[in-house]
Amino acid sequence: MPSPHGGVLQDLVARDASKKAELLEIAQSGDLTSWSLTARQICDLELILNGGFSPLDGFLNQQDYQSVVEKSRLQNGLVWTIPITLDVDAEFASQLSPDQRIVLLQDNEFPLAILTVSDVYQPDKAVEAKKVFRGDPEHPAVKYLFEQAGEFYVGGSLEAIQLPVHYDYPGWRKTPAQLRLEFESKQWDRVVAFQTRNPMHRAHRELTVRAARSNNSKILIHPVVGLTKPGDIDHHTRVRVYQEIIKRYPNGMAQLSLLPLAMRMGGDREAVWHAIIRKNYGASHFIVGRDHAGPGKNSKGVDFYGPYDAQELVESYKNELDIEVVPFRMVTYLPDEDRYAPIDEIDTDKTRTLNISGTELRNRLRDGGEIPAWFSYPEVVKILRESNPSRPKQGFALVLSETLPAQLKTALLSTFLQYGGGRHYKVLEHGNNEEILALVPDFVRSGTGLILQNASSLKGTNVFKIGEESGSDIPLETEDKNILHIVQRVVLFLEDQGFFQF
């Protein structure tokens, strides 16, 4: 088992356990300034406190931050590729000074740690965006930098009170110390870690087993359940899938543990960071995928990162990281032999292969199409269908232009109710109340068919606008105010979109 990055596991919770009561009393006294952490900051803090970000024992000061941005190294020379910073707004920053202690809160309530401020500095976000994430304005991390992150960063060391509170999957959230102890007790000295932010299917099971066999190792399935790419499948659905997949490995070969990481989708730099984290968790090998941690297409329609940038950068640090890189070998299904095989071992001109892309899978889930057993296990498909119902079971919101007759809402409701099918329908009277309008996505996700008027700013999945204005999803002629004509047009539109099946 490799040593933690930097030689020592910075388990701050264990280190500070003897003074937890004292720290908690100080934090709850009201004498210290407090900061309520964002979702990303909570993820970062948890991995500092539990040692997943070893050798870090706090948020980066300005010197370390600049060194990481410019050189992918801390000031002491250790490889570190992603800046871990505590961003705050200008008003809060103005209240801080060196050596001041501040309380870091979860949900503005639970004290997690006390930070002793080393410095407060204003980063050059343009340089960070370019050096760390290649600068494209469409990159999720660049968007976060300029649209969400505070203007100032606070550096400093941490004293741990407790890890963030999680109410889901407590048995699957292993800290680095816990995993290392389990690996040691089971004599797992060689462990290959598999990073994922997506559901797993048969191909993933096959490639991880092959990686383990070729390296004479065990398998750590280590999915991210913090923040991932916007639009990804929620972690609850994914964890239910992982719990089923883990049953499909030979007994004693694989272990599942959840990683509370806030991904930056930083491609090659992020892959190095992921390798360091897995090393801290006790893995000796790490599978680096094709376009690892890549966010897709940039503003010019080209992939943000090259397909092998991540593998090449991790490999270049191999001697310093003390973790073996296992290149992701894509496998494909051979229907004539009923087995999976690495695609680079197959002559595709002579051998028939089958595959289902991510886009095709989403289409089949949406349309209720078949997902064959060779692609995924029935239990996994069932979970995905529950969380991704087909169009006839999905909700929608129809937003009527304010110029349309109010009676149209009643006409649409009556028409929809006669079709049955189990979907609930509701006319939502909102009075431009933002709190009520904020509930629309929840209604839609629950499968409700909503009808509302005078909410032109409303946007989202399965939200359709009806009217004569340009940009309407269901355009109407200005002179057409015949309610029956409009109802028919709406019904045909919804049928075409798959919400109704006659």
From Swiss-Prot:
The active site is at T196, R197, N198. Residues 1-167 are annotated as: N-terminal. One of its GO terms (biological process) is hydrogen sulfide biosynthetic process. InterPro entries: ATP-Sase_PUA-like_dom (IPR025980), P-loop_NTPase (IPR027417), PUA-like_sf (IPR015947), Rossmann-like_a/b/a_fold (IPR014729), Sulf_adenylyltr_euk (IPR027535), Sulf_AdTrans/APS_kinase (IPR050512), Sulfurylase_cat_dom (IPR024951), Sulphate_adenylyltransferase (IPR002650). It is found in: Cytoplasm. The oligomerization domain is distantly related to APS kinases, but it is not functional and does not bind APS. It is required for oligomerization of the enzyme, although the oligomerization state has no effect on the catalytic activity of the enzyme. Belongs to the sulfate adenylyltransferase family. This is Sulfate adenylyltransferase. It comes from Kluyveromyces lactis (strain ATCC 8585 / CBS 2359 / DSM 70799 / NBRC 1267 / NRRL Y-1140 / WM37). The gene is MET3.
